[in-house]
């Protein structure tokens, strides 16, 4: 197969591993910067051009699109879809997962347990918003934040009100969640490919922090997950229509709670911690799914 990887930086670990895995399985791979793709949208001769040439047909496309370029990145991916390429995560599913409010609404509708969550823009009654999630301590996040940026733990009601008021001054959407103290700064990242959790790690926040993101200095170890956690991770992935996802789960007293579903999970932390060849699992999934019938259907 001819496979395109959409990424702004082909030297990143995940891109390198996906290219290696695909080539080892006999596929041709090209890494394309989605922002350098430009498109001819036509009822008779739609095409995608890249650095002065028209791109050939690709059997499959692997989107590694950062949140900062979601709009144009998914637009480029959608053009590949319309031309009959199989996407490892459809553009509509990526957009759905990147919209934190929409994704939480969909997960909740499917009965997937979440931390108590309130979302607001300019709440007239900050006290009521805080009470909605059970009071302090609580976590205040910018809806557009990623990798732990724009996330604050407010230990008291007064601190929570101050943080919410400060964020409101940024003219930003605010997400307020209950603080799961019993998780003790840890979460579980389940890497889902298709209908299977292929690997799971426990991420522990560095001392003095509560954010477990590896980009923030968190530590990772292999996680043993329960059947319930496994089922929830798969259900969350399928609810958002994703083929591949990193599902972040908090272990609360009342059971596992889904914190976030990442549509473009990094492979480095999970592969190096667990030793699982996730990249090859992803390519194998493409091989099973990128049938002519599927590509004809998604191409419209």
Curated annotation (Swiss-Prot):
Respond yes or no to whether keyword ATP-binding is given for this record: yes
Give the protein family. Belongs to the RimK family.
CC per GO annotation: cytoplasm
Protein name listed in UniProt? Probable alpha-L-glutamate ligase
Record-annotated residues binding Mg(2+) 1?
Answer: 248, 260
GO terms classed as biological process:
protein modification process; SOS response; translation
Residues reported to bind Mn(2+) 2: 260, 262
One GO MF term on file is: ATP binding
Quote the record's binding site residues for ATP.
141, 178-179, 187, 211-213
**Keyword presence, Magnesium:** yes
Could you tell me which InterPro entries the record lists for this protein?
A: ATP-grasp (IPR011761), ATP-grasp_RimK-type (IPR013651), ATP_grasp_subdomain_1 (IPR013815), RimK (IPR023533), Rimk_N (IPR041107), Rp_bS6_RimK/Lys_biosynth_LsyX (IPR004666)
Instruction: Give the cofactor note.
Output: Binds 2 magnesium or manganese ions per subunit.
Keyword annotations of the record: ATP-binding, Ligase, Magnesium, Manganese, Metal-binding, Nucleotide-binding, Protein biosynthesis
Q: Where is the ATP-grasp domain?
A: 104-287
Give me the residues that bind Mn(2+) 1, please.
248, 260
- Which cofactors must be present for this protein to function? Mg(2+); Mn(2+)
The record's section on PANTHER family has: RIBOSOMAL PROTEIN BS6--L-GLUTAMATE LIGASE, RIBOSOMAL PROTEIN S6 MODIFICATION PROTEIN
Top-level taxon in the UniProt lineage: Bacteria
Q: Which residues bind Mg(2+) 2 per the record?
A: 260, 262
